[in-house]
Each structure stands twice: as C-alpha cells, then as structure tokens.
Swiss-Prot record:
InterPro entries: Ribosomal_bS16, Ribosomal_bS16_CS, Ribosomal_bS16_dom_sf. This is Small ribosomal subunit protein bS16. PANTHER family: 30S RIBOSOMAL PROTEIN S16, SMALL RIBOSOMAL SUBUNIT PROTEIN BS16M. The keyword Magnesium does not apply. Keywords: Ribonucleoprotein, Ribosomal protein. GO terms for molecular function: structural constituent of ribosome.
Length: 92
C-alpha cells in the first residue's frame, strides 16, 4: 500500500484549515485516512502549523512519502530539520 502524508481540507467555504494526515495514495483528498498527525491554519497571522513529530517520524521510517506542500510546511516549521538531525545521529 502506497502511503502519503498530505493535507485534508476542512472548514467552511472561504475559511479553510487543513489536517495533516497519513492516507493511502489512492484515496480521495478529503476521503479516508489512516491517522491524523497535525494541522495547518493558513488564515492566522502567522500561519499556525502543529505536527506530532513522533508520529511523523514513525510513518516516515515506515516509508510514507510527503507531498510537496507538506514537505514545505515541515521545512518552514523546522520539523524536517529536526527529523534529519535525528536520522544523522542514528547513522553515527
């Protein structure tokens, strides 16, 4: 099963917020998901990003792929950098 970490749109018309979810790549954008690992609210100033880094790490170690948008959000919030540093420490 191909698994992706991606955004699921929630909220009202013209008032979106997004859940960061782990889902099967074949399921629809707003359809079924396996697990919610965070959220992103673009309308707040500054945009609010919250990620459960432990869950993200587990899914990435199991082979889940991030979409480009999620990758940029992780990079912006510093999550990607911390996950990379942990991985470098594990390698030695």
């Amino acid at each position: 099963m191909a698994v992706k970490i991606r955004l699921k749109r929630m909220g009202a018309k013209r008032d979106p917020f997004y859940r960061i979810v782990v889902s099967d790549a074949r399921s629809p954008r707003d359809g079924r998901f396996i697990e919610q690992i965070g959220y992103y609210d673009p309308l707040e100033e500054p945009a609010r990003i919250s990620v459960d880094e432990a869950k993200a790490r587990v899914w990435l170690q199991q082979g889940a792929q991030m979409t480009e948008t999620v990758r940029s959000l992780f990079k912006k919030s510093g999550v990607l950098e911390r996950l990379g540093a942990e991985r470098a420490e594990e390698r030695g």
